[in-house]
């Protein structure tokens, strides 16, 4: 049976202590034979609403902490890059380089990521027609010398795409489940269940969110039939330094993931 991709971890590296506490609680997913697990956290949140918002420890210290997670827990690592000159250094630690949604069309960034040995996760911009994500995927594939396109070509060459909602007026996002089907023509699809419930700028200088919708939307995405899920999670989301309002509490993640595995099995059995 094909493994379900699961990407999970705190939004940003708040401290090594917190990262290790979260990783300790996520290690069972890493040991699950039905899950392809990636630990996620950011060394720098370069697109915060306010200049006063916490951004993280920065590249050098952040990579040291992520490497320590890899060494201690044997986990694969996913983290995002915001500038082309970060790609090579980050790929020495990260197994997956994530392209932020706002930057999903930035050719230089995509090319820099493609030139590394890492897989590439492209988050679809909140502004983007889902069918247009194929052009971002092609930038990575063609940089890697791959002229073929479509799901199989992307899967074989370590490229996947993530849905994280579409702008719906000011300060709100909605999820069009049709986009999951459309994007899966071009690459394996990850559903970012936590950013999809974000309310950009709604907290006055920072983003709000509706975390009560994380699990229902994840279940709906699983029923569509996709490749994996992305959850930002925290021991205490109310105290998180970034994206707390849309995070899923660690205490809820296990049951949520088990439900998603059950739904995926039903979908596979009935195809």
UniProtKB/Swiss-Prot annotation:
Cellular compartment(s): Cytoplasm
Major localisation: cytoplasm
Gene3D superfamilies from the UniProt entry: Aldolase class I
High-level lineage: Bacteria, Pseudomonadati, Campylobacterota, Epsilonproteobacteria, Campylobacterales
Annotated Pfam families: DAHP_synth_1 (PF00793)
Record family assignment: Belongs to the KdsA family.
Record-given protein name: 2-dehydro-3-deoxyphosphooctonate aldolase
GO annotation (BP), single: keto-3-deoxy-D-manno-octulosonic acid biosynthetic process
PANTHER family listed in its UniProt record: PHOSPHO-2-DEHYDRO-3-DEOXYHEPTONATE ALDOLASE
Class of enzymatic activity (EC top level): transferase
Record bears the keyword Magnesium: no
UniProt catalytic activity: D-arabinose 5-phosphate + phosphoenolpyruvate + H2O = 3-deoxy-alpha-D-manno-2-octulosonate-8-phosphate + phosphate
Keyword presence, Transferase: yes
Keywords recorded for this protein, A-Z: Cytoplasm, Lipopolysaccharide biosynthesis, Transferase
Single Gene Ontology MF annotation: 3-deoxy-8-phosphooctulonate synthase activity
Domain of life from the UniProt record: Bacteria
Pathway linked to the protein: Carbohydrate biosynthesis; 3-deoxy-D-manno-octulosonate biosynthesis; 3-deoxy-D-manno-octulosonate from D-ribulose 5-phosphate: step 2/3; Bacterial outer membrane biogenesis; lipopolysaccharide biosynthesis
HAMAP family for the chain: KDO8P_synth
GO annotations of cellular component type: cytoplasm
EC number: 2.5.1.55
């Amino acid at each position: 049976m094909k493994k379900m991709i699961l990407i999970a971890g705190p939004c940003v590296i708040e401290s090594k202590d917190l990262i290790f506490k979260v990783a300790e609680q996520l290690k069972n997913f890493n040991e699950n034979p039905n899950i392809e697990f990636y630990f996620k956290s950011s060394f720098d949140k370069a697109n915060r609403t306010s200049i006063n918002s916490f951004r993280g420890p920065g590249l050098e210290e952040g990579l040291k902490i992520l490497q320590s997670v890899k060494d201690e827990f044997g986990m694969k690592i996913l983290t995002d890059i915001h500038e082309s000159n970060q790609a090579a250094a980050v790929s020495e630690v990260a197994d997956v380089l994530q392209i932020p949604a706002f930057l999903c069309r930035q050719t230089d960034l995509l090319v820099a990521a493609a030139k590394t040995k890492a897989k590439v996760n492209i988050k679809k911009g909140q502004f983007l027609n889902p069918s247009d994500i194929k052009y971002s995927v092609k930038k990575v594939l063609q940089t890697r010398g791959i002229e073929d396109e479509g799901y199989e070509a992307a899967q074989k060459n370590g490229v996947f795409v993530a849905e994280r909602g579409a702008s719906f007026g000011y300060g709100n996002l909605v999820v069009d489940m049709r986009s999951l089907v459309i994007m899966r023509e071009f690459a394996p699809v990850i559903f970012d269940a936590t950013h999809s419930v974000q309310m950009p700028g709604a907290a006055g200088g920072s983003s709000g969110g509706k975390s009560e919708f994380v699990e229902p939307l994840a279940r709906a995405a699983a029923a569509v039939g996709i490749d994996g899920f992305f959850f930002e999670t925290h021991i205490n989301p109310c105290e998180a330094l970034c994206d707390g309002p849309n995070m899923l509490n660690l205490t809820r993640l296990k049951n949520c993931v088990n439900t998603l595995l059950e739904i995926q099995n039903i979908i596979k059995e009935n195809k």
